[in-house]
């Protein structure tokens, strides 16, 4: 038997997915080079060549178990150490590997964060419209409510007045996504 809650969530309409499907259909009809897909955020810029070169080198030289096997829950220690060093160098911080928790993507990271912060159904996570529709799924999966702050439709920056009114003793997190998904807006330095 499937969870009724998840089944209902899966039935919810997503205009973003509709646009993506339409774009794929049009690409077959008129050629992919004539369709600009601004829907689901698939990367359109290749990774730096150093990434490709390193991946190929590791595939040829590293132990296959190291490449394809499981890691510790937080991720490979050496990688987390290097990420901490990079952050410290670029942003003048003092992170260590203990501050870095690697996941397989943003969805997993948000799910883990929500589960870590949420303690009961009265808890809430706040985000800003427009927002990635699956944020509601992550909040529901963590057992809390997602509160959505209306968009400032002039510039799509954060509506601080409504944010202040919405924050309560039940607020566990405020999810800020910049560049915003789905609008693509980057919050200004003043907003941040």
PLM segments and residue spans:
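N-terminal small-domain helix-loop-helix segment of the aminotransferase-like
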Residues: 2, 9-105
């Amino acid at each position: 038997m499937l969870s009724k809650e998840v089944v209902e969530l899966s039935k919810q309409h997503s205009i973003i997915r509709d646009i993506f499907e339409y774009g794929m259909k049009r690409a077959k009809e008129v050629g992919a080079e004539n369709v600009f897909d601004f829907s689901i955020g698939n990367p359109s810029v290749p990774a730096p060549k150093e990434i490709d070169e390193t991946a190929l080198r590791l595939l040829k030289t590293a132990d296959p178990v190291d490449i394809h096997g499981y890691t510790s829950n937080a991720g490979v220690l050496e990688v987390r150490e290097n990420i901490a060093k990079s952050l410290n160098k670029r942003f003048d911080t003092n992170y260590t590997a203990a501050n870095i928790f690697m996941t397989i993507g943003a969805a997993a990271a948000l799910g883990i964060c929500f589960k870590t912060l949420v303690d009961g159904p009265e808890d809430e996570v706040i985000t800003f419209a427009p927002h990635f529709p699956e944020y509601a799924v992550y909040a529901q999966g963590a057992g809390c409510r997602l509160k959505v702050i209306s968009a400032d439709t002039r510039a799509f920056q954060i509506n601080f007045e409504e944010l202040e009114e919405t924050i309560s003793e039940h607020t566990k997190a405020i999810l800020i996504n910049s560049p915003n998904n789905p609008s693509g807006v980057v919050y200004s330095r003043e907003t941040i």
